[in-house]
């Protein structure tokens, strides 16, 4: 017995196949829990993806939807429609941060188009932006555009991408790690560059703010991490080998709450530094390349090019490892309540409780 082909539409079928493949090959580069962080029960978080979108999801809604779906380690996961979505960038959105800790915070994102864009979080969360609208109907409140370098005869360089951001609301600053091997300090009020940090020989992967010492730290493809003085723009210390033959890119870094300890992801290793002593006190080997790292008080969380979330103590002892749904994980986001959201290849986000159980696993619908 054969099906009825009278209503067959080849164009619609082709479009549906392409859409399905696009969703399955999307990458989540960053997840971020929304303020106010003081709320003990986490709910709202934002997902930045390779299709340039920012999607806002409600954890409570996702958990109720996934109750009947179950946990999947493969690509067969629940597809969830976000509460709100906006196309933030032309090209991938690489990072998302909240500037401020209350409902008046700014939602900031950066991406491959060399721009930082910002929205009022309250307006973003309450906006009526339809998932099915192709155009961006929620205009950014803030837009910072990377400078282009002028060459011979006035020719401008391509727009360098922005791979990561860090925020310092105390000084009114946003720091960006760019593809032109420079880091930039932006004034949020004026939208102007306050300082340019030059010294790396290759593009930057990451930047973190150390506000207690008026410093930033950057990690680069050139295999080094650098500490910079925000008052002078000068590099005060270079961390890591400068030997081009043995260097491995510094892909991620994080500071602890005291801003005395720094952990760097470099190749298949974590390097733990005591900053006041300027000493690397621990090197922790990892089976796969590190792609994100963060502190949870006196412990280190890390993910990489494998479907595992690992937790270490400061002595390098492995405390736990939890299997997660993305086959390659690019992002960890920790809520103060202990809930972790990881995102990665396939556009998959896996939300894990403080006890190690999977609260929900999903793929966000796209524009």
From Swiss-Prot:
Keywords: Abscisic acid signaling pathway, mRNA processing, mRNA splicing, mRNA transport, Nucleus, Repeat, RNA-binding, Transport, Ubl conjugation pathway, WD repeat. GO terms for biological process: abscisic acid-activated signaling pathway; mRNA processing; mRNA transport; negative regulation of abscisic acid-activated signaling pathway; protein ubiquitination; regulatory ncRNA-mediated gene silencing; RNA splicing; ta-siRNA processing. GO terms for cellular component: Cul4-RING E3 ubiquitin ligase complex; mitochondrion; nucleus; THO complex. It is found in: Nucleus. Pathway: Protein modification; protein ubiquitination. InterPro entries: THOC6 (IPR042626), WD40/YVTN_repeat-like_dom_sf (IPR015943), WD40_repeat_dom_sf (IPR036322), WD40_rpt (IPR001680). WD repeats lie at residues 23-67, 88-129, 157-196, 199-240, 243-283, 285-322, 324-363. Disruption phenotype: Increased sensitivity to abscisic acid (ABA) and salt. GO terms for molecular function: RNA binding. It comes from the Eukaryota. It holds the Pfam family WD40. Component of the THO complex, which is composed of THO1, THO2, THO3, THO5, THO6 and THO7. Interacts with ABI5, DDB1A and DWA2. This is THO complex subunit 6.
